[in-house]
């Protein structure tokens, strides 16, 4: 099977235009819709392609998943034990301290401020990732993807906490 970029007719680039991605995705969904098949075999084939298109779209539209996928295309798997130890002990310590702060914060406005800080950090990391992939600096891209993953974890925790206090 083609890689997700090829499947959706896109250039393999981290910095993709999300509107073009969406346009390509919907065009391909229409083209391979199972109801358009004339035979049972064609319908089954279209179901497989449609499922693959769904996976490709959900992966490429998400900045973190797209980065992980692009690294995977270069045989770099962030789920490997080695990749999990990319961040320094200081960075990991800060991450765990922040998790504790979030856990102990009960005032919604304080949680919103923390969330805004991490959304800004997430944007900065994504911009840095664009540059790392553009320069084909896979080492830097791997570290930045790992950081983005931790930031995402903090943001998810914040989201849940904010939702529970409203």
Curated annotation (Swiss-Prot):
GO MF, one annotated term: protein-folding chaperone binding
Coiled coil: none
Organism field: Rickettsia canadensis (strain McKiel)
PROSITE patterns, alphabetized: DNAJ_2
Domain named J: residues: 3-73
Claim: Ribonucleoprotein is one of the keywords in the record: no
Entry-linked InterPro entries: DnaJ_domain, HscB, HscB_C_sf, HscB_oligo_C, J_dom_sf
Family: Belongs to the HscB family.
Presence of the UniProt keyword Chaperone in the record: yes
Gene3D superfamilies (alphabetical): DnaJ domain, HscB, C-terminal domain
Name by which UniProt lists this protein: Co-chaperone protein HscB homolog
Taxonomic superkingdom: Bacteria
Role noted for this protein: Co-chaperone involved in the maturation of iron-sulfur cluster-containing proteins. Seems to help targeting proteins to be folded toward HscA.
Biological classification of the source: Bacteria, Pseudomonadati, Pseudomonadota, Alphaproteobacteria, Rickettsiales
NCBIfam families: hscB
Subunit: Interacts with HscA and stimulates its ATPase activity.
Entries under SUPFAM superfamilies matching the protein: Chaperone J-domain (SSF46565), HSC20 (HSCB), C-terminal oligomerisation domain (SSF47144)
Keyword terms, alphabetized: Chaperone
Disulfide bond entries: none
One BP annotation, GO: protein complex oligomerization
């Amino acid at each position: 099977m083609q890689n997700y970029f090829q499947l959706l007719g896109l250039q393999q680039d981290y910095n993709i235009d999300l509107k073009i991605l969406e346009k390509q995705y919907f065009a391909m969904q229409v083209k391979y819709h199972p109801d358009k098949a004339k035979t049972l075999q064609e319908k089954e084939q279209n179901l497989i392609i449609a499922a693959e298109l769904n996976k490709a779209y959900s992966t490429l539209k998400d900045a973190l998943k797209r980065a992980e996928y692009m690294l995977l295309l270069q045989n770099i798997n962030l789920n490997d034990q080695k990749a999990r130890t990319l961040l320094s002990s200081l960075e990991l310590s800060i991450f765990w301290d922040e998790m504790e702060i979030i856990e102990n914060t009960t005032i919604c406005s304080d949680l919103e401020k923390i969330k805004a800080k991490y959304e800004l950090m997430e944007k900065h990391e994504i911009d840095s990732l664009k540059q790392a992939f553009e320069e084909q600096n896979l080492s830097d891209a791997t570290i930045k993807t790992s950081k983005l993953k931790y930031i995402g974890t903090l943001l998810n925790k914040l989201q849940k906490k904010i939702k529970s206090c409203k």
